[in-house]
Amino acid sequence: MYVIHLAEADESNASISSEEDLGHLDYSKPFAAKQTQPKKSISQIIKDKKKQTQLTLQWLEDNYIVCEGVCLPRCILYAHYLDFCRKEKLDPACAATFGKTIRQKFPLLTTRRLGTRGHSKYHYYGIGIKESSAYYHSVYSGKGLTRFSGSKLKNEGGFTRKYSLSSKTGTLLPEFPSAQHLVLQDSVSKEKVDTLIMMYKTHCQCILDNAINVNFEEIQNFLLHFWQGMPEHLLPLLENPVIVDIFCVCDSILYKVLTDVLIPATMQDMPESLLADIRNFAKHWEHWMLSSLENLPEILSEKKVPIARRFVSSLKRQTSFLHLAQIARPALFDQIVVTSMVNDIDKVDLNSIGSQALLSVTNDQDSDFYSEYDSISVFQELKDLLRKNATVESFIEWLDSVVEQKVIKPSKQNGRSVKKRAQDFLLKWSFFGARVMHNLTLNNATSFGSFHLIRMLLDEYILLAIETQFNNDKEQDLQNLLEKYMRSADASKATFTASPSSCFLANRNKPGVSSSDSAVKDEIPPEDDYLTLAAAQQGLGAGTVVYHSADPDNFTIAGQMDFSQNSAPLMTPPISPAMMNRSSVINQGPMAMRPQTSCPIQGQLPCQTFPEPLYQSLHNPPSGSYPNASYYQPMFRTQTHTESGRYAFSGHHLSKDCFSNSCTASPYGTRGSSGGYTAAGDAGMETEAVQMLESSGFGFGGTTGAADGCSGPVCSSGHRYYGSSSGYVDAPRMGTFIDQHVSVISSVSSIRSVSAYAEAHDPLNILDDTSRKTRPYYTELSAMGTHTAGSSIAHSCSVSAPCMYGAPAPYHSQNTLLPLQGATEIREMMSSLPPINTVFMGSTSGPP
């Protein structure tokens, strides 16, 4: 027999592991028997194979279902298939062939390798067992009686990392009931009820956040602040029975999420300090609530306190059980201890204990109650589990079946009270266990301490399972109460059964669809609302939002805008109203208070900005994406000026203010951004001027990053959009810009004027390269300086920012300005500029 060892690949379609799928060999018929069978024709073999495949597909349809987020061990599924073949008297296919058959039925099924190194197993991801299947209870042990039921599969592989509340950071509460769905009296304002429920949900979210941060002491302050600081106009609502019952429903939702967050259902080990903090929190919770409800209507405390007590009791019970499970787990893994326990329990005469007077007394009316024979059989099963070196999870699975068979199911069959049946079971279970411990004491059992620990663990879980059943009944009463007040029963069920979400976890119930729940903070924002970096790297393309409005006066920003109805990514996300007209105190560099020496700013419009690395990665959209640019700040708009308003470059001299010692940056980073577009009627923008724009800057053209920059009249009047290129001539310089920190808050309203020309930063002395000087343009020249002799210049200004380099060059290179103007202007300008080696080399010699 050959054993196939798998690689670490996760997406395996046909391979099997060495430990999983060997059972099919048991079904192989002896070779001699096969020789005696009549040989089938090829057509008959194909026909039988096709028939068996159809039967297998139908069997898969009857027993399994697509279930997003569920993992099922591949060996278990193959074992089910072998059982099916045995019952149907079919020759089972190998695991590889069976894997292909599964994918015929579930084409989207994937395979994952889960578990620690050396103990990993392959799992089918995205498939689950139907509850109607005969295999459901054998794998999941039913739905389980507690949160810890069914954790066997989750813990398979032996995860040992301790539980941390930091893994729950970002957990959000599900939706609370809405006043729009409540049946209220006409005198009750739905607006006030909605306000009160919204306030209470915020209050509950604060409690949850502080619990996750292990800041339990602060929770008392939140309780006092909310209830004792209730606004006067909302106080009458606290006397309304419907509103109080809705508070109880909200409390139940909060307690469910708190329990899920504080206590891991996978029975991970928890730090002792965290367990102590949770116990202390449970100890004080009821007192904190009663203190916060003083001087408020009595109906509040009458309804809220019983629910709080159930929550506290459940929290204490679960922490106690989890603590005992952590202590008992090493004992159950110790083979010497387990062997000693088995030897000691074998010396106990269980029949003599069962025949004692208390257990032998029966009532004719309650003849179906838990008897002494049941006690003996249960403890016999316990001995068998110890012999099999069962884990804590196996004991839980066994106890679930015991409580289900001995308490819950008989109560449902004969209509008797579950509480009465549970009381009888607990009485006889405790008595039988005490007599077993009595015998161990008399026999001087060496494993008495270990057995006492195991017994405490079993007792605690049985109490937890029964209490959970009682709590579930109370939860059902709240559900019925909510349905009574809701207009739609479906709405009440959706609200009450909603699961907590996480802002760091995607919604698994609806993959690929953005959640409509406003309380759910998705891990990835909806693609309809924002332009993510991944989308930006793929280019805007045809999905770019096209703005058709040509009237800039009709476009205003009032508060936070909602772009949820758009079907394509937007360039900017909504901005907070508080940030719209607030100046920045972060980006105030040396140019912050400089008087205006360039063109004046036109009408100002608040503009949202992105960090520079995002815009460096954006590809240019197709032309015509942003006609008229009416949705942007004036510095990014197409600006049309009359002939008299244009600035001829030859008619103006550049002052030294244009060459300051600070960097200038647009709101998108340190790279120069164009301050204006050439208007449709402006013919001054010629091809040679366009050559000043290179793909490394934020050009206006649609270039895809060619190394030679823009070629041709790419900045003509037909291209009215703001684009950027992802191509950069100098890769090291690109990395330098990406590594720089770009502050989140940028100056929005009080835009400070800067010089009409950006500086060329060269911390690595790249511009000193003679081979680069021969080029007709430089990558770092701002697009604001794209002018030719005799052409007009559009009014533009940029936002100043601190220089991102240690020692920026305060002046432009002479060679940088050579393509801009004629010989006369160059000579006049050179008289006011220092030599290039003085700027970049620190030399005091004259110009080269």
UniProtKB/Swiss-Prot annotation:
Disruption phenotype: Impaired endocrine cell differentiation and accumulation of islet progenitor cells. GO terms for molecular function: DNA-binding transcription factor activity, RNA polymerase II-specific; RNA polymerase II cis-regulatory region sequence-specific DNA binding; transcription cis-regulatory region binding. PROSITE patterns: RFX_DBD (PS51526). The lineage of its organism: Eukaryota, Metazoa, Chordata, Craniata, Vertebrata. Transcription factor required to direct islet cell differentiation during endocrine pancreas development. It comes from the Eukaryota. It is found in: Nucleus. Belongs to the RFX family. This is DNA-binding protein RFX6. It comes from Danio rerio (Zebrafish). Gene3D superfamilies: Winged helix-like DNA-binding domain superfamily/Winged helix DNA-binding domain. Keywords: Developmental protein, Differentiation, DNA-binding, Nucleus, Transcription, Transcription regulation. Pfam families: BCD_RFX, RFX_DNA_binding. Expressed in progenitors and hormone expressing cells of the islet lineage. Residues 56-131 bind DNA. GO terms for cellular component: nucleus. GO terms for biological process: endocrine pancreas development; glucose homeostasis; pancreatic A cell differentiation; pancreatic D cell differentiation; pancreatic epsilon cell differentiation; positive regulation of DNA-templated transcription; positive regulation of insulin secretion involved in cellular response to glucose stimulus; positive regulation of transcription by RNA polymerase II. SUPFAM superfamilies: Winged helix' DNA-binding domain.
